């Protein structure tokens, strides 16, 4: 299988998000990379579903809460920027203060 670097990145994010979801199901708090992956995957999948940018920016801030991440992680993440493919092209989506 020949994948572009961008496709490899998307695959890694998707896999990390799957790991994060399993850890949340077990009650394990997420670390920084897991939290970023989960939020990023939410945005990428939402874009593929055709959800608008503004909706993803707002909804992305409600994917995970402070109680679901390790101490200090919420303070480390001010913005998450994801380049996602929408039906009308690729756009940069910024989720401000994603862990509340």
UniProtKB/Swiss-Prot annotation:
EC number from the UniProt entry: 3.5.1.5
Keywords: Cytoplasm, Hydrolase
Coiled-coil stretches noted in the UniProt entry, renumbered to this chain: none
Cytoplasm listed as a keyword: yes
Induction remark: Repressed by ammonium.
Keyword presence, Coiled coil: no
EC top class named in words: hydrolase
Family label: Belongs to the urease gamma subunit family.
Name of the protein described by the UniProt record: Urease subunit gamma
Protein's organism: Rhizobium leguminosarum bv. viciae
């Amino acid at each position: 299988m020949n994948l572009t670097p961008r496709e490899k990145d998307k695959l890694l994010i998707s896999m990390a998000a799957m790991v994060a979801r399993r850890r949340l199901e077990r009650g394990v708090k997420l670390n920084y990379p897991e939290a970023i992956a989960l939020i990023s995957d939410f945005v990428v999948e939402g874009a593929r579903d055709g959800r608008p940018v503004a909706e993803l920016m707002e909804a992305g801030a409600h994917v995970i809460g402070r109680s679901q991440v390790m101490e200090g992680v919420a303070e480390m993440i001010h913005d998450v920027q994801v380049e996602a493919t929408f039906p009308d092209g690729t756009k940069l989506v910024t989720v401000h203060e994603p862990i509340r």
